Amino acid sequence: RPPMVSHSSTDNDPSTAGHSNQEGSSRIPNFFRMPIAERIGALHQRGLLSADDVQLLSSGNHQVQLNVADKMIENVVGVFGLPMGVALNFLINNRDYVVPLVVEEPSIVAGLSGAARLARLGGGFTVAPVDPILIGQVQIVIDSDPEQVKQTLLAHREDIVALANSLHPKMVARGGGALDIEVFDYQAEEDGRLMVVMHLLVDTRDAMGANLVNTMCEGVASYVEGLTGGKVFLRILSNLTDRAIARATVRIPVKNLEGKGYTGEEVRNGIVLANDLALADPYRAATHNKGIMNGVDALALATG
């Protein structure tokens, strides 16, 4: 798996963003004109790649071997390769990042690098800390009053949280673990069956957390059944991570948008108009979001 290569930058003055000899800098002019070996060397020279990274990238042997692939998934008949590039110029919270991207479509890497350079000239991106809260769902099918079931669960929230945390004491020792519960009730559309869903809110720290959350949900299921008199069915992580949303902001001086015969104000107004259409029209929104996903998908493939 290719690393997310980064290095702290001590020079936060945007006026120096074009200096290519700065150690750790992700600003490397003419990078796209270099031969591949020279690109790898430039990243290594700046401390953005380790010696092991250089050896691996220089070997040209990047494909998973067929016998290894056959042990990873079912019905293997081959392996599939895609180009891996790096987006340059990222300055995030005053730290330089070179971002690996795996993608087959041209212009995505260049476009992302160009946008990052524009952001860099204005001071770069600012990212707020994210609380790594994941949600585990415990589905309880009931015959009784859902409000009473919910109140029963809430009355025993401390016991439920303590039981969940007893299953992962090391996570609790690292400052994470189950924090709280939430309860909701629903009625099935077809047959009117009543169900209560309990959310277990879990701070997973630096762990991805899926197995941890699943184990906690499974571990409290019997106790929840005893409390409610219902029957627990699903007990599993939710992939809607709306409690762990990363937020980034960037400020770009209007004068930096000037180019190709347009003033900075004209470019700014055009961006705002395009965004207004995406907010109002689902057909533009789909295209708008596809452009965003070009970068998200490429980064996800590169970093696993």
Locate the predicted segments by residue.
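Acidic/polar, glycine-rich intrinsically disordered N-terminal extensions of enzymes
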Residues: 4-97, 101, 105, 125-133
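Generic structural signal for well-ordered, non-membrane alpha-helical segments
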Residues: 36, 65-69, 105-109, 149, ...
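Flexible, glycine/charged-enriched surface loops at secondary-structure junctions
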Residues: 54, 124-130, 167-180, 227-239, ...
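A short, flexible low-complexity segment enriched in Lys/Arg and Gly/Pro that occurs
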Residues: 56-77, 173-188, 257-276
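Anaerobic metallocofactor- and corrinoid-dependent redox/one-carbon enzyme cores
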Residues: 61-78, 83-87, 109-110, 274-291, ...
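Small-residue-rich
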Residues: 69-72, 78-193, 197-201
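Glycine-rich anion/phosphate-binding loop at the beta-strand->alpha-helix junction
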Residues: 206-208, 213-304
